[in-house]
Amino acid sequence: MSLTGWFIGMQNSTYPLAVSMAVNAVNIVCSLCFVFAMRLGFIGIPLGTLAAQWCGFILSAFFAARMMRKETLGYAPRIDEMLRGLGRFFSVNRDIFLRSLCVMAVMLFFTATGARSGNMTLAVNALFMQLYLLYSHFMDGFAYAGEALVGKYAGAADKHSLRRCVSHLFAWGWSLAAIFAFAYGVFNHEVMSLFSDKPEVVAFAAAYRWWIALAPIAGMAAFIWDGVFVGLTATRQMLLSLAGATAVYFAIYFLSPFPDANSSLWTAFLTYLAVRGVILWLCFARKNEY
């Protein structure tokens, strides 16, 4: 994972893709061999995963060495510079760790609350979350691009290119969000049928289809800004935005006027996504150096 982040930071997405494909291929082949050919049973599955992870590590190390041979080191950093850099490194990791805790709290509460509303609601919410995750995988591509490009322009103090990059990211983000929102809202029955063969679940999902249709619109800015702020290493603002959005999430849920608990839950979740984007936009707008 560390080398994957480094590759993306160096604006090389080809190597992470190759490593990911190799890991999955080795995992499938080794698991089949261990389980069926060698008759190890379920023990063969983790062994296949272990072999795949080692393959991924070796391949990543090879790619990293290959890239580093092409890089020219300008100078050897002094001890005090290394210590300052290490302190900054741990500070960034602390902020991201605390931010992740907030995300986990929101998602755990969402799942637990949906479960208390009945099996049908739990099933529909689980499927809707799969749709949201599908959308998030597409948006992560723009976020990763933002991390690398914004980091490059921020390091070069090129404000014009940085702002132009952010504008382009949002243009692509809005376009993708509109496509997913249209598909989830208008073709909800067809989309849900791809994820469930239970007619009653698909029919029940129709009553809440506009919640999942609004999710791409509400969450788009949060994805883009996350990539931008990672590129700026402005993790403190990311933490504060997530903490503020989490507080709003719980407040909206418990104060919501909806008699339907699931509608209150989705109102809180969509507001949480939107607030994240708004807070980060305000942080970006206030920083003159950006």
Please give the residue ranges for each predicted region:
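Small-residue-rich hydrophobic transmembrane alpha-helices
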Residues: 1-16, 124-186, 220-233, 237-241
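Hydrophobic faces of transmembrane alpha-helices in multi-pass small-molecule transporters and flippases
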Residues: 10, 14-21, 59-62, 78-109, ...
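Hydrophobic alpha-helical transmembrane segments in multi-pass integral membrane proteins
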Residues: 249-255
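Short runs within selected transmembrane alpha-helices of multi-pass transporters and secretion channels
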Residues: 1-9, 16-24, 45-61, 140-143, ...
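Helix-terminus/linker motif at the lipid-water interface of multi-pass membrane proteins
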Residues: 30-40, 101-134, 152-153, 190-199
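Short loop-to-helix capping motifs
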Residues: 12-13, 41, 119, 198, ...
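Short alpha-helical transmembrane segments in multi-pass integral membrane proteins
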Residues: 26-29, 35-97, 150-215, 255-290
